[in-house]
Amino acid sequence: AGFEDGFSFTITVPSNYQPHIDTAQVLKEEFKKIGVDAQIQLIEWDSWVSDVYQNRQFQSTLVGVDASNITGSAMLQRFTSDNAKNFINYSNADYDAAFEKAISSTNDDEKTQYYKECERILSESAANVYIQDLPEFVALNKKYTGYEFYPLYIQDIAKLRLADE
């Protein structure tokens, strides 16, 4: 496996976000094993937002996807060709048609089938590669109890109480 003649590309990451820098370094080493030269370009956060995210000037990047709204439409809409948040410039007419049918449908089973079609298209075209889910760290003074972790990023302090001393 690998690329006999190899190739090179640049991973552009914000210089102020260590998890992305660390991930880029791991990817660089892994790509080297298959004959691919990945260069890491560190840029300031403001430049990353304007050049990479907004103006889509990059070969490759790492990004944390906001999953605060995990409805099918919210997660899949970002890949429609004309979506402002489609910063990877993904464009696929079949995907766009399936997504439009999904959001237009009033039948939940039909909507689900169209969303599955969208996911199949994304998977087959490798629109994105999800590589990690960063852990959540919480520092809590030991005088408090009742903090709960949730599968999504939620800070619910309703059950937080002073511990019995």
Predicted segments — roles?
Residues 65-69, 88-91:
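A glycine-rich, aromatic-flanked flexible loop/lid motif
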Residues 69, 85, 105, 119-120:
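Alpha-helical interaction segments
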Residues 1-67, 136:
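Ligand/substrate-recognition segments at binding pockets and active sites
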Residues 22-33, 50, 93-100, 109-120:
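Solvent-exposed, polar/charged alpha-helical surfaces in well-ordered, non-transmembrane soluble domains
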